[in-house]
Amino acid sequence: MKKTIMLIAAMCMTSAITFAQEIIRVSTEKTDLVMKVSPKGRLYQVYLGDKLQNPADYENLKWDVYAASDGAVCQRGHEVYATSGAEDFFEPAVAVTHADGNMTTYLYYKSSEQKAVKGGTETVITLQDKVYPLTVKLHYVAYPKENVIKAWSEISHKEKSAITLWRYSSTMLYFKSSKYYLTNYHSDWAKEGQPETTQLSTGKKIVDTKLGTRAAMQAEPFFELGFDEPAKENEGKVMLGTIGWPGNFRFTFEVDNVGALRVIPAINPYASDYKLKAGEVFTTPEFIFAMSDNGMGEASRNLHNWARQYQVNMGMGDRLTLLNNWENTGFDFNQQSLAELMKDAKDLGVDMFLLDDGWFANKYPRKDDHAGLGDWEATKSKLPEGIPGLVRDAKKAGVKFGIWIEPEMVNPKSELFEKHPDWVILQPQRDTYYYRNQLVLDISNPKVQDYVYGIVDRIMTENPDVAYFKWDCNSVITNIYSPYHKQNQGNFYIDHVRGIYNVLTRIHNKYPNLPMMLCSGGGGRMDYEMLKYFTEFWCSDDTDPYERIYIQWSLSKFFPAKTMGSHVTNWNKNTSVKFRTDVCSSCKLSFDIDLKSLSADDYKFVQQAVKNYDSMKPMILEGDQYRLVSPYEGSHCAINYVSKDKQRAVLFAYDLHPRYKEPQQNVKLQGLDAAKMYTVKETNLMPGKQSDLECNGKQYSGDYLMKIGLNVFTAQDGTSHVLVLE
């Protein structure tokens, strides 16, 4: 008996020693996230920061950083996935009500494994409760060259009946610094990407939305963190973070009693106490983050490179320029007028004509936004030959054809609503609130998923030459009640988004090379999960070039230019067509304008600008972006793109509202080859106009251009210059 006891004790000691020595490292070329198992088997974050070069240093990292404090084991360190109802007094990563009503959970380390994935390494850590058959798997994918990490979690169980999840975070990250500065982004219709910087103090700050169909409107699903000082462009320690979830999201930033910051990205638990059945797996959204000691610019470029290579649909492919009819015609068009616009698109030089809203429904024709949504057949009175006739006309004109859809929505005045009122999110016993005169389909319902998939599949099956979809989503969820979920409404918000994923996965599997643009009341859907299925997104319905400069500056922190749709329109006609075009050319250029209203010189200009853009596209869409002069810090803005081989670059310079006799500073470029000689040539000039820039046509070394720079700003409102360096 004595020997048995000694053997058991030895085994326990061995187990404890094994746990104590267990170190898990998630690493890029510049960043380390290090976790360590405590003697009692709990998992703690012991380090997140610059990559440590000496492996022996990891042994010196302590899990019990607050060992002198009172309290239980969780309070002594930074538990990787803190639970609720047990020892931690701050915001948890996960909270569960077990099948028997118990609200406590303790997670212990079981195992970890690493495997190679495209571009990086995935680490999977398994945690388990010792009392209840509950398992949490933590996933981390590290992309070494891009210095980007994405993280998500999976929750499952084998209890006798369903458990309730009321917190379900993607991950939990800890930081220790003297000060923390959060820049989050608020928004509204036509006011996307408005930054607001706050120093975080002891306590909790929450950024969230409750919109249902989109992540963004009042708040955006991305943020910046500056450590010790507000995040800067080219210096200082920063983190950029974003969550991939086109629904209700929540960022929690909590500074505890000892000054440590925990960052918790998650689905918003609002109205979402989720019933999880035994054997099912609850998968959280991906949280993507990049850290840098050299400011936001470097972190952004890393995110851009990662996104193009590993996340965005056709991220390394080309993008189509297009002419949209919306601001030209609105709902008032017919087949003949569209055929003329297709000819205009060809003459302009763009790749495609995009037909916007108003082409569908017969019993209740789509004459305005009060009717027709849900009835996706061409209106015979407008388009007697339907989509096939439009595709034929586009071919005849020599351009591709794309089409607008809003398949997640329905008007009460539609045949679909008459046939399937049970497919609609709607409170049956209350007055109905309409958002843009429409309602949202309940895509948590598999039958509705089949219907939405069938819209795209039918169009593509009957018209395989359709080259592009603009997928809109103009309404948030109102009248919150899912006929499909009945008594289980807590699952609705989350299952609705998963239903959208199911539809998009089916579309992508069948049509993997089909470009699609996200649109949602402007820029309501800007997230990296949806971009797995879409090639680009619409930044904002605000196409005033002044406002677009600010919006595009903000969004470029997190998204590469090739994902950001920017159209030349008639908004703010007081600005020149050149200024409007130059602003849009710094992203994914397209047009939504009445070309026939342009003067002869303006028309010649936009034709040449399209050709110039085609030449510059490799730099803008694939190159490295450098934000040089912020519009938020003065009256001007400048950015440059540099090709990967540093042989070519393009500089965009904009004068917004300069002050009287304001002294002009040179713009110092970045990212060039210091030893290379670059010839500077201004492009996008009006017909017959010569460049008035002293630098035009001259040669400069990259070193000169980066240290001394070029005089490209003026004192005139709404002036722009585009310079190519090669």
Where are these regions (language model features)?
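Bacterial Sec-dependent N-terminal signal peptides
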Residues: M1-Q21
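Polysaccharide-binding surfaces and accessory modules of carbohydrate-active proteins
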Residues: E22-S27, T31-M35, R42-E254, Y270, ...
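Short Pro-Gly-centered flexible turn/kink motifs
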Residues: N102-Y108, Y274-D293, G718-E726
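Aromatic-lined carbohydrate-binding/catalytic grooves of carbohydrate-active enzymes
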Residues: M314-G454, N463, Y468
